[in-house]
Each structure stands twice: as structure tokens, then as C-alpha cells.
A protein has these predicted regions:
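Active-site metal-binding motif and surrounding structural segment of the metallo-beta-lactamase
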Residues: 46, 52-104, 200-202
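Histidine-centered divalent metal-coordination motifs
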Residues: 71, 75-81, 157, 219, ...
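Alpha-helix termini
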Residues: 63-64, 90-99, 121-127, 230-240
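Short, well-ordered amphipathic alpha-helices
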Residues: 56-60, 85-92, 115-120, 223-233
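Short, charged/polar "capping" segments at the starts of alpha-helices
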Residues: 111-116, 252-257, 279
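Metallo-beta-lactamase
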Residues: 98-163, 170-171, 270-272
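Cap/insert and terminal regions of metallo-dependent hydrolase folds
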Residues: 182-276
């Protein structure tokens, strides 16, 4: 399984567009891996996770033709993860010779309502609308998504909404995708223990950076990443071969990429960056 982290930043990106804090100024000066666009991940070139307004930039930077993608998973409706109006260019006079004529979007009932609301105001042209389907599924439900079996996990994030994390397997390799979320609930951890034989990769929310454990219910920080890694190994879900990645990084609680790597040095946790490729 090839995992490409197209965007590794939190909700405002890093540096944030309007921000003059020391961290953002340092990131502008450092460039490279310290520049983080909005969160998005691509699996094997055919399964996309989330669809922020930075999607076109991600396609350009990675050399990906999004017309080759048949399936899209949405974690939740916050704008840094789902900007459905960007789909208006998928077809008609805007896109030709699309390899995959139909894009199937999957997410919670909350995501479906948001999708319908946006396009009740921002109409899709007939040709574009014909090529976009939505398949709603419930928490803990598993469904076949192209070459994968995907299971939705309730995320600790966005009170009043229905956010998901995902277990994604191709039958040989399994990814635990834990963005955006606080430390998983015992119910979710129990489900993972009972249903995930082995996680080959775990991508973890690290939004809270150096903040103390439990600083915010809806995001994890670096210490919680370390705790979760040890928990998954102790519970038998992960082992020394599992790739752990801290992702969804913001300027409020984390410095430049090299400084974050220093924090995780010796822990076996990698720090995500835009364009990062994992082969598991």
C-alpha cells in the first residue's frame, strides 16, 4: 500500500495566511517541510481521503491526475477537510478524458446533508452531477470501497457533527487513519482491539503539539501520540513493524519541522510533511 500525504497541516495551514507569529515567520523562512497545506491523503493513487480547498495545489505538487480517483472518503464537514464546491470542475467543459467517469463520495449522514446543502445553492452542471455519487454509511459499518474494505470509526471531534476516522485495508495491509480526533474513546479502542488484527500504519492527529495531555478533547498532541503508540503495541494491534506518523500539525503548538522531529527523536514516530510517501 502506497500512502501519500498530500497535505499535513491543520485547519489554517502552516504558516497561516494572516498570521505573523514566531512559528509562522520561522516556517516562511525555513520553507521545505515546514510549509504545510490542508490535510489530505491519497492511497495507491485511487482512494482519496478528504477534499479541502488546497486539493488542486496538491494535485499539481504531487503530479496526480484526480480524474484517476474513483473513491473519496470524507472525515467530517469542517472546511479544511471538505470543500465540495471544488468538485464543480469535475467534468463538463472543465475536465475531459476523465479516466474514472464516476467519483463516489463516502461519509456520515452529516457529510451527506452538508453535500446536499452546498449543491442546493451552488448548482452542479448536469454533466458534472452525473459523475458524482454519494454513499452514506454509519459508524462501525464496513463497506467495500474499490479495492479496499473501509470501516468508519467515531472520532472525538466537532461536537454537534458526525466525524469519522477510518480503518482501511486492502486485504494485505491495514491503515488506521486517526485525523481529526482527540485520544480515541475506550469504545473505539475496544473495537480496534477486537477487529484490527494488525495495523501496518497509524496516522495520528497531532494538532495540539506540545500542549499537555488532555488539553483539548477534539485533538491529540505529541505526548498523546506517544501514549497511543505504546497502547496499540501493548494491546497487540501494532508492533515494531508498524509505521506511526504524527500529522495535522499547526503553528499554535508546534515549531518548524526539524524542531518537531527532535521532539519525536527515539520514539519511532515519524513527522508528516507535504508530499511524504509511505510504502507499507
Amino acid at each position: 500500500m502506497k500512502i501519500t500525504i498530500l497535505g499535513s497541516g491543520g485547519g489554517e495551514g502552516y504558516p497561516a495566511a494572516f498570521c505573523g507569529c514566531d512559528h509562522c515567520n520561522a516556517a516562511r523562512a525555513a520553507g521545505g517541510k515546514s510549509i504545510r497545506t490542508l490535510s489530505q491523503t491519497l492511497i495507491n493513487g485511487d482512494l482519496l481521503i478528504d477534499f479541502p480547498c488546497d486539493t488542486r495545489v496538491h494535485a499539481l505538487n504531487s503530479g496526480v491526475n484526480l480524474g484517476d480517483v474513483a473513491n473519496l472518503l470524507i472525515t467530517h464537514t469542517h472546511s479544511d477537510h471538505f470543500a465540495p464546491e471544488e468538485l464543480s470542475c469535475r467534468g463538463g467543459c472543465f475536465a475531459h478524458n476523465i479516466k474514472e467517469p464516476t467519483l463516489t463520495i463516502r461519509g456520515s449522514s452529516d457529510v451527506k446533508r452538508f453535500f446536499d446543502t452546498v449543491f442546493s445553492v451552488y448548482n452542479l452542471s448536469g454533466k458534472v452531477a452525473e459523475g458524482i455519487l454519494f454513499d452514506e454509511f454509519a459508524a462501525y459499518e464496513s463497506c467495500r470501497v474499490g479495492n479496499y474494505t473501509v470501516t468508519a470509526l467515531p472520532a472525538r471531534h466537532a461536537q454537534g457533527l458526525i466525524p469519522y476516522n477510518y480503518v482501511i485495508t486492502d486485504g494485505e495491509k491495514t491503515l488506521l487513519y486517526l485525523l481529526d480526533t482527540g485520544y480515541p474513546t475506550e469504545e473505539v479502542l475496544a473495537f480496534i482491539r477486537e477487529n484490527v488484527a494488525h495495523a501496518d500504519a497509524v496516522i495520528m492527529d497531532a494538532t495540539m503539539g506540545v500542549a499537555p495531555v488532555g488539553a483539548y478533547y477534539g485533538h491529540m498532541g505529541f505526548e498523546e501520540n506517544k501514549i497511543l503508540k505504546e497502547y496499540l503495541i501493548t494491546s497487540g494491534v501494532a508492533d515494531a513493524s508498524t509505521v506511526f506518523v504524527a500529522d495535522h500539525i499547526t503553528h499554535n503548538k508546534a515549531e518548524t519541522h526539524d524542531k518537531i522531529e527532535e521532539i519525536f527523536d527515539g520514539t519511532g514516530i515519524l513527522v508528516a510533511y507535504d508530499g511524504m510517501v509511505l510504502e507499507i
